[in-house]
A protein has these predicted regions:
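Active-site-adjacent pocket-lining segments in enzyme domains
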Residues: 1-109
Length: 109
């Protein structure tokens, strides 16, 4: 699992080649510049590509972690974590309210 701009490091290492991934919208072009063989998803809170799961921002990382718990274990356990942490889970990976921030931050020089 990778949170925020960690996907840029995975991309630079070639670990995301041929896979879908996402990154923080404010640093998206920076991440994209690290992996031209990555299928970058601009409007995703997180992307589950099987072996690698990437999230856009830090709070999206919590949503991603809950989705992984649900996939690996079950929905009941994920809901328990939600309740214990008093967190409002955004379950839809493709419903990113921050997509409009795409490319408004740091770009590679």
């Amino acid at each position: 699992m990778s949170v925020c701009t960690g996907s840029a490091l995975l991309a630079k290492a070639g670990l995301l080649d041929g896979l879908a991934a996402t990154s923080n919208k404010m640093f998206f072009e920076l991440a994209r510049s690290q992996g031209d063989k990555v299928d970058w998803q601009e409007s995703a809170r997180w992307v589950d590509a099987g072996q690698y799961v990437t999230s856009s921002g830090v709070s999206a990382g919590t949503d991603m972690a809950l989705a992984v718990i649900e996939r690996v274990f079950d929905a009941e356990l994920a809901e328990q974590v939600v309740n214990y942490t008093e967190y409002q889970w955004h379950r839809q990976a493709d419903a990113d309210p921050f997509a409009q921030l795409l490319n408004q931050g740091v770009t590679p020089s």
